[in-house]
């Protein structure tokens, strides 16, 4: 059946994971038609695994490629195609409600989860409606050394949310490391508006008309799961829907009117004071008072 190519088994789930968390983690890969998290009716807790059904088989395949062996709430999860047993013709009961099926295909996960009991997974606070941040080793961390005029201003350290927007995060990471032969080093923040944002990333024309992504000229909006909830968030600048390149901006304040229009893909973890120094060089029309240069950039490995 074609359905089997669209239903994924997700094992190794932490106790805190629910259908909302799973939906947020898997929706970047395509439309989801159903999420099932089987319960242990004695404990009234889930059994450590779930089933996610995509509308398209290719989206399910993309989810496996990106999510298998990734981390969610401090645990490494396994993601692969579900292997349903044959059930009686005409039955509308999902195969994963059958105890024999569960014993056959979920036993390993249940045992592993029992072994891990006693070591509580770290609690992660998130903005309402946003997925939890994975451990720092799963999400890349990058930095930019900033120079204002001729003086060093300090370093901005950023966490990239590859758990939510892997394509957008990878583009930015590569532009920080220059591993594709081009990137941000030596480019400027060409547009700075106090109490709004600081925009940079045009390393070709240096005025907001250029730049390019590692995928070619432009790439599509990946998703709008993360929101512009406050200062220090990293988001893609664009010239309309699906026109992402290399230009980005750092928010100086909450900018929720940009939600659904610009892809948020990271946040400052250290160096918010440096962002405030950049912001101080701005003006109402966006023209910087002094040159603000990315003198160096790279990835923490």
Curated annotation (Swiss-Prot):
Top enzyme class: isomerase
One GO location term (cellular component): U2-type catalytic step 2 spliceosome
Keyword Ribonucleoprotein in annotation: no
Alphabetic keyword roster: Isomerase, mRNA processing, mRNA splicing, Nucleus, Phosphoprotein, RNA-binding, Rotamase, Spliceosome
Keyword Membrane: no
SUPFAM superfamilies reported for this sequence: Cyclophilin-like, RNA-binding domain, RBD
Pfam families linked to this entry: Pro_isomerase, RRM_1
InterPro entries, per database record: Cyclophilin-like_dom_sf, Cyclophilin-type_PPIase_CS, Cyclophilin-type_PPIase_dom, Nucleotide-bd_a/b_plait_sf, PPIE, PPIE_RRM, RBD_domain_sf, RRM_dom
Renumbered residue ranges of the record's region Disordered: 107-137
Domain PPIase cyclophilin-type: from-to ranges: 143-299
Function summary: Involved in pre-mRNA splicing as component of the spliceosome. Combines RNA-binding and PPIase activities. Binds mRNA and has a preference for single-stranded RNA molecules with poly-A and poly-U stretches, suggesting it binds to the poly(A)-region in the 3'-UTR of mRNA molecules. Catalyzes the cis-trans isomerization of proline imidic peptide bonds in proteins. Inhibits KMT2A activity; this requires proline isomerase activity.
Record PANTHER family: PEPTIDYL-PROLYL CIS-TRANS ISOMERASE, PEPTIDYL-PROLYL CIS-TRANS ISOMERASE D-RELATED
Similarity field: Belongs to the cyclophilin-type PPIase family. PPIase E subfamily.
Subunit structure: Identified in the spliceosome C complex. Component of the XAB2 complex, a multimeric protein complex composed of XAB2, PRPF19, AQR, ZNF830, ISY1, and PPIE. Identified in a pentameric intron-binding (IB) complex composed of AQR, XAB2, ISY1, ZNF830 and PPIE that is incorporated into the spliceosome as a preassembled complex. The IB complex does not contain PRPF19. Interacts (via RNA-binding domain) with KMT2A (via the third PHD-type zinc-finger).
This protein's name: Peptidyl-prolyl cis-trans isomerase E
Lineage: Eukaryota, Metazoa, Chordata, Craniata, Vertebrata
Gene label: PPIE
């Amino acid at each position: 059946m074609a359905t089997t190519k669209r239903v994924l088994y997700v094992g190794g789930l932490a106790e805190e994971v629910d259908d909302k968390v799973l939906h947020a983690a898997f929706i970047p890969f395509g439309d989801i038609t159903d999420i099932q998290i089987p319960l242990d009716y004695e404990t009234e807790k889930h059994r450590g695994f779930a089933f996610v059904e995509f509308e398209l088989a290719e989206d399910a395949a993309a989810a496996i490629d990106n999510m298998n062996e990734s981390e969610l709430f401090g645990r490494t999860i396994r993601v692969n195609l579900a292997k349903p047993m044959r059930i009686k013709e005409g039955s509308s009961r999902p195969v994963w409600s059958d105890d024999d099926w569960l014993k056959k295909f979920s036993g390993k996960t249940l045992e592993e989860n029992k072994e891990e009991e006693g070591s509580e997974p770290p609690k992660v606070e998130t903005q309402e409606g946003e997925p939890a941040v994975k451990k720092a080793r799963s999400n890349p961390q990058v930095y930019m050394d900033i120079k204002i005029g001729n003086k060093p201003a300090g370093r901005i350290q950023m966490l990239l949310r590859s758990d939510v927007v892997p394509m957008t995060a990878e583009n930015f990471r590569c532009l920080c490391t220059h591993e594709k032969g081009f990137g941000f080093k030596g480019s400027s923040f060409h547009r700075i508006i106090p109490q709004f944002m600081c925009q940079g990333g045009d390393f070709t024309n240096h005025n907001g008309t250029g730049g390019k992504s590692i995928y070619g000229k432009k790439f599509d909006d990946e998703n709008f799961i993360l929101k512009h909830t406050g200062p220090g968030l990293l988001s893609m600048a664009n010239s309309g829907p699906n026109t992402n390149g290399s230009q980005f901006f750092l928010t100086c304040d909450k900018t929720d009117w940009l939600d659904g229009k610009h892809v948020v893909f990271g946040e400052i973890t250290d160096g918010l004071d440096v962002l405030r120094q950049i912001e101080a060089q701005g003006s109402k029309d966006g023209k910087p008072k002094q040159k603000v240069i990315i003198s160096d950039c790279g990835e923490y490995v």
